Amino acid sequence: FVNQHLCGSHLVEALYLVCGERGFFYTPKAGIVEQCCTSICSLYQLENYCN
């Protein structure tokens, strides 16, 4: 996994991969779209959205 732009279904798939059974809290208000789609995010940043 390298830092990359993740948008739409790619972002959701990446969250499933990173969070696994923990699941994740997804809401556009949390800024994940700005952080990972508009900008580039890392695996570490994605983990912040796991439950």
From Swiss-Prot:
Pfam families attached to this UniProt entry: Insulin (PF00049)
InterPro entries given in the database record: Insulin, Insulin-like, Insulin-like_sf, Insulin_CS, Insulin_family
Compartment list: Secreted
Family statement: Belongs to the insulin family.
Known partners and oligomeric status: Heterodimer of a B chain and an A chain linked by two disulfide bonds.
One annotated GO molecular function: hormone activity
Disulfide bond annotation, renumbered to this chain: C7-C37, C19-C50, C36-C41
SUPFAM superfamilies reported for this sequence: Insulin-like
GO CC annotation terms, alphabetical: extracellular space
One biological process term in Gene Ontology: glucose metabolic process
Keywords carried by this UniProt record: Carbohydrate metabolism, Disulfide bond, Glucose metabolism, Hormone, Secreted
Signal peptide extent: none
Coiled-coil region list: none
Protein's name in the database: Insulin
Taxon lineage: Eukaryota, Metazoa, Chordata, Craniata, Vertebrata
Domain of life: Eukaryota
Described purpose of this protein according to its UniProt entry: Insulin decreases blood glucose concentration. It increases cell permeability to monosaccharides, amino acids and fatty acids. It accelerates glycolysis, the pentose phosphate cycle, and glycogen synthesis in liver.
